């Protein structure tokens, strides 16, 4: 499998870091600019986008969460909603074989399907990268 440096998948960890101006936010900002210019393709599964929403909802309330939903939907990102049998088998294999959340398994499977680098700072993905299942663009040291 060949992973392209012109294709990236956003994990919720990366988007939340960007929204909260945490470590790595500058990298996300640069990637969003490149996607806006059409130099790269940027993807995110709706399951992971839902993770962003519920995280903001839990921490900051529904009004801000709704505003973030509208804001992120305008990012230069291709939002995916694939729930096909083949894709779900890929998701469940990641979840069954690695100590990651179910939502993280969607990000990993999307990365494989799109042959794209996964953008995250979540150390749970280290095992998948170590085993050569995905390639990661780390937004911070893990």
Please name every model-derived segment:
Residues 1-7, 80, 112-142:
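Acidic, PIN/NYN-like endoribonuclease modules and their adjacent C-terminal/linker elements
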Residues 3, 78-117, 121:
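Active-site neighborhoods of divalent-metal-dependent phosphate/nucleic-acid chemistry enzymes
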Residues 37-39, 74-75, 114, 131:
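Structured helix-beta-strand junction loops
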Residues 59-62, 98, 135-139:
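Short, hinge-like loop/turn segments at secondary-structure boundaries
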């Amino acid at each position: 499998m060949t992973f392209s440096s012109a294709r990236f998948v956003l994990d919720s960890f990366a988007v939340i870091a960007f929204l909260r101006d945490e470590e790595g936010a500058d990298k996300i900002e640069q990637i969003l600019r490149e996607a806006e210019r059409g130099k790269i393709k940027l993807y995110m599964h709706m399951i992971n986008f839902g993770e962003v929403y519920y995280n903001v909802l839990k921490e900051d309330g529904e009004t801000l969460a709704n505003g973030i939903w509208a804001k992120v939907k305008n990012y230069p990102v291709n939002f995916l909603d694939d729930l096909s049998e083949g894709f779900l088998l890929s998701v469940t294999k990641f979840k069954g074989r690695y100590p990651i959340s179910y939502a993280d398994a969607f990000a990993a499977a999307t990365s494989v399907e799109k042959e794209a680098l996964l953008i995250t700072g979540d150390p749970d993905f280290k095992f998948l990268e170590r085993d050569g299942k995905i390639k990661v663009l780390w937004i911070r040291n893990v």
